[in-house]
Amino acid sequence: MSFTPANRAYPYTRLRRNRRDDFSRRLVRENVLTVDDLILPVFVLDGVNQRESIPSMPGVERLSIDQLLIEAEEWVALGIPALALFPVTPLEKKSLDAAEAYNPEGIAQRATRALRERFPELGIITDVALDPFTTHGQDGILDDDGYVLNDVSIDVLVRQALSHAEAGAQVVAPSDMMDGRIGAIREALESAGHTNVRIMAYSAKYASAYYGPFRDAVGSASNLGKGNKATYQMDPANSDEALHEVAADLAEGADMVMVKPGMPYLYIVRRVKDEFRAPTFVYQVSGEYAMHMGAIQNGWLAESVILESLTAFKRAGADGILTYFAKQAAEQLRRGR
């Protein structure tokens, strides 16, 4: 859409007029961030009464399920509509075939049941991916040459997604980037009677260096070692490819799509929203959080940068944001910034 201003010449047009007072700035504000836009990712540990700090993500902790329920009381009271669960798998439960991913008594499955029972109004989004469960840290099953096998991996992902739906997850979020996994998961959910379980597809997930602290948090960094995920996650240099990925996922039955990472990919968010007009989400990933929080803690940036960064996602076209700042943002919004 082109924009051609007509007869808007200074001094008759003074764009600062509407900026003069707070009330007029509020009246003409184009994008508004609310707590309804926020999804809080959380890391869940095995055990009882466990809390572990994550050095690369200051202020974020891994929590056992009992501690998660305690913290969730405050998150729900703040109005945060949904949590995204990421399990921290003990080393002894990791394997080449990622069988723990679909264990009905796995961490994610038990956490989902506990949260749904305590907070039935809270949205629970579960991660469908194999990297927390494999000994090599990749998102799929490997062949003898170390290449991730697409269709074999999908079979495991389907079993994982079904186990999450059976535990009560309202949204499953495949983050693996295997071709065709959305269609396979949708078909399996329909066949099992989970017709209202939504799929939030990590459609445009880039092979990014911004994920480092997350891999520390879930304990997959040491398993992955010097490996990378370039054979299935997207090349950061590509833009058009994101549209092909989103189109495929929507055609296969995704209810929502996601762009990840966030701030370095705002233009991708805009392109996806303009092209498809589908529910579009964005992930302010661990590296983005670590940079912002580090700067805030050192006094280099004001805490107001949290809402500014999240508003940028809304301006780019995002309908919702996964952010480790969800609690702080909700508190700031409640205070009126």
Which residue ranges define each predicted feature?
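Alpha/beta enzyme core
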Residues: 2-4, 9, 21, 34-39, ...
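N-terminal intrinsically disordered, cationic/polar leader segments
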Residues: 11-14, 29, 35
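Acidic, Ser/Thr/Pro-rich intrinsically disordered transcriptional activation regions
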Residues: 16, 20-24
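N-terminal leader/domain-start detector
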Residues: 20, 28-31
